[in-house]
Amino acid sequence: KLNQNLGPVKWSSNLVYSRNRNKVVDMLDSYKLSNGTVISQDSMVMGGTTGVKMVLREGGQIGDIYVNTLKTDEHGAIWVSPTGSNVAPAKDTWIYAGNSNPSYTLSWRNEFNWKGLSLGFMFNARVGGVGVSLTQAAMDYFGVSERTATDRLNGGALVNGQRIPAENYYQTIGGNGADAIGACY
C-alpha cells in the first residue's frame, strides 16, 4: 500500500498478488449408507455437462477439468467411418484438459481524493487456468461458428489428414460435448 499527498490531492495505491496451489491428498475410501449399502469411490464428479466435468481425485487438484473425446483406432488415431464421412464419440472416455484455477491473480487499485471528491479505479488480471466454452460447442453444432465456416469452405474438417463433411464432424463433436476440448481456452 502506498499513500502520497500531492499538495491538495491525496493518492492511495494498492497492489495485490495472490496464488493458490492445492492438491487432493486423501479421499474417503468408503462409507456406509443407512440401508447398509457400502459405497466406494476413488473420484468424485463435482459437476459438469454432457462432454465436460470437474473431478476430484487423489493427487489431482480442485478445479481439474476432464472432457469427453472421440473414438480412436488401435493406433490412437481418431476413428473415421469406412465411408470417410463420420467420426464417433468415445463412450465414457475422459481426458484431462487442465485446471480452471488461475496460476495467479493480480490487482492494482488507485484512488485520488481532492476537496471531498474521490476517484478510484482498479485493474484486475486472472492469469492462467483453462476455461471451456459450451457456447462454442453449440455454435459448432449448428454450423454458425467461424471455424465451421472455414472448414465448409475448405471442403470439410481435416481429420487424420483427410477431409470429412464439416456438418457431420461438428454435429458429432458439438452435440456430444466432445467439442469441449476444442472449445478450451
State the predicted function of each range.
Residues 30, 124-127, 132-139:
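Short Gly/aromatic-enriched secondary-structure transition segments
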